[in-house]
């Protein structure tokens, strides 16, 4: 049960997000203690203590980089062939896909994927995974959610990791490449994280596999593309780690959070009752440990407010979204992460004490008005 309830909102083990503390494409989540990164960034002392795992991680990262270069080069060759094969009378790409999303509704990574699918009007079925038994994903050796099963004609593909799912599907929508080919550009690799545990990471996860013309048409320039990637990674590496310490900040907030989780999740009657009270108590104490791990302030609301205002400043006053006149993948990622707090005290405080509400409501409206 403890493992199940800890999977419902993110913490250090909720997803194999990254290898070590890779810098967020130029955007660092710098703490007051001088640590960089989101999940327990590595200071000098930590580096000395964890030299073995970090060396293994560095070696795996180097291998992953070589893999990424190989797959990127292979993509360029394949893209040339695909452009020659593509028909001017190509069927609507979205209508060729049948998608099934395996999720926990209250998971911010799953919420990110839903925001993407809804904004792009991609029809999909939802399977709510029981967080205790997880029988719904027993078919998969990859045991985290979200998982998307994508049927394209006779081809059935499994997509893992929220950012890979989004990047692969967006590449598909823009380029028309077969999804079976696209997913090979995001190869998984095993690595050892700072806690000495083996994790799965994916190469190129924030990169869309587009040719120059497609990239120019979508972004208009390299700066917009880099900005989108940077803030998508920031959402995964920093923003998401502020959720649990804030929604479980006090015993009352922890109980309210688990009341919401039980109502929205796929629990049995007994499991739900146990999760509500035992889970709330467990996560209240775990949230304190997460606060220390991520070097948050005593009042974790301050970190949440700071992150929200930092995002709003990055969007700026001259455009409604980071994507300009419509949300881009960074807008959808940040929105998806924050949305899981709706209905909770932390969300109300966030809307009241930061400048994020106008942007948040614009994204909400853009998703609601997406053509069906």
UniProtKB/Swiss-Prot annotation:
Binding positions for glutathione? 145, 161-162
Q: What is a single cellular component term in the Gene Ontology annotation?
A: endoplasmic reticulum
Q: What membrane topology term does the record carry?
A: Single-pass membrane protein
How is the activity of this protein regulated? Isomerase activity is increased by sulfhydril compounds. Dithiothreitol (DTT) is most effective, followed by glutathione (GSH) and 2-mercaptoethanol.
Q: Which GO terms describe its molecular function?
A: 12-hydroxyheptadecatrienoic acid synthase activity; glutathione binding; heme binding; lyase activity; prostaglandin-E synthase activity
Q: What is its EC number?
A: 5.3.99.3
List the catalytic activities from the record: prostaglandin H2 = prostaglandin E2; prostaglandin H2 = (12S)-hydroxy-(5Z,8E,10E)-heptadecatrienoate + malonaldehyde
Residue span(s) of domain GST C-terminal: 259-372
Q: What residue stretch is flagged as signal peptide?
A: none
Residue intervals passing through the bilayer: 55-71
Major subcellular location class: membrane
The UniProt keywords, alphabetically, are: Cytoplasm, Endoplasmic reticulum, Fatty acid biosynthesis, Fatty acid metabolism, Isomerase, Lipid biosynthesis, Lipid metabolism, Membrane, Microsome, Phosphoprotein, Prostaglandin biosynthesis, Prostaglandin metabolism, Transmembrane, Transmembrane helix
Write down the PROSITE patterns for this protein, in alphabetical order: GLUTAREDOXIN_1 (PS00195), GLUTAREDOXIN_2 (PS51354), GST_CTER (PS50405)
* One of the GO BP terms on file: prostaglandin biosynthetic process
Cell location: Microsome membrane
| Changes after translation | Synthesized as a Golgi membrane-associated protein, and the proteolytic removal of the N-terminal hydrophobic domain leads to the formation of a mature cytosolic enzyme.
Job description of the protein = Isomerase that catalyzes the conversion of PGH2 into the more stable prostaglandin E2 (PGE2) (in vitro). The biological function and the GSH-dependent property of PTGES2 is still under debate. In vivo, PTGES2 could form a complex with GSH and heme and would not participate in PGE2 synthesis but would catalyze the degradation of prostaglandin E2 H2 (PGH2) to 12(S)-hydroxy-5(Z),8(E),10(E)-heptadecatrienoic acid (HHT) and malondialdehyde (MDA).
Q: Which family does it belong to?
A: Belongs to the GST superfamily.
What this protein is called in its record is Prostaglandin E synthase 2
Please give the organism.
Answer: Bos taurus
């Amino acid at each position: 049960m403890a493992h199940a309830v800890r999977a419902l909102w993110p913490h250090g083990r909720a997803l194999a997000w990254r290898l070590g503390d890779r810098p967020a494409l130029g955007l660092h989540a710098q703490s007051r203690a001088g640590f960089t990164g989101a999940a327990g960034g590595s200071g000098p002392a930590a580096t000395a203590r964890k030299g073995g795992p970090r060396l293994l991680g560095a070696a795996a990262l180097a291998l992953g980089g070589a893999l990424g270069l190989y797959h990127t080069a292979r993509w360029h060759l394949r893209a040339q062939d695909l452009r020659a094969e593509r028909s001017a009378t190509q069927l609507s790409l979205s209508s060729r896909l049948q998608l099934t999303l395996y999720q926990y509704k209250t998971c911010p990574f799953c919420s990110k994927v839903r925001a993407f699918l809804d904004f792009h009007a991609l029809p999909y079925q939802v399977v709510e995974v029981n967080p205790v038994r997880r029988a719904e994903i027993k078919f998969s050796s990859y045991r985290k959610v979200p998982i998307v099963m994508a049927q394209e004609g006779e081809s059935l593909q499994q997509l893992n990791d929220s950012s890979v799912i989004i990047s692969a599907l967006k590449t598909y929508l823009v380029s028309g490449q077969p999804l079976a080919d696209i997913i090979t550009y995001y190869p998984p690799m095993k690595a050892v994280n700072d806690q000495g545990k083996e994790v799965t990471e994916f190469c190129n996860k924030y990169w869309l596999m587009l040719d120059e013309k497609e990239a120019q048409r979508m972004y208009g320039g390299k700066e917009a593309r880099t900005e989108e990637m940077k803030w998508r990674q920031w959402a995964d590496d920093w923003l998401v780690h502020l959720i649990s310490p804030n929604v479980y900040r006090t015993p009352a907030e922890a109980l309210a959070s688990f009341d919401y989780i039980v109502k929205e999740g796929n629990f049995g009657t007994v499991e739900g009752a146990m999760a509500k009270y035992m889970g709330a108590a467990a996560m209240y104490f775990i949230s304190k440990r997460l606060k220390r791990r991520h070097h948050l302030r005593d009042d974790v609301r301050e970190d949440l407010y700071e992150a929200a205002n930092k995002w709003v400043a990055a969007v700026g006053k001259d455009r409604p979204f980071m994507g300009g006149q419509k949300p881009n993948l960074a807008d959808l990622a940040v929105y998806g992460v924050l949305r899981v707090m709706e209905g909770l005290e932390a969300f109300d405080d966030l809307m009241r004490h930061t400048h994020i509400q106008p942007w948040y409501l614009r994204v909400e409206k853009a998703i609601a008005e997406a053509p069906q």
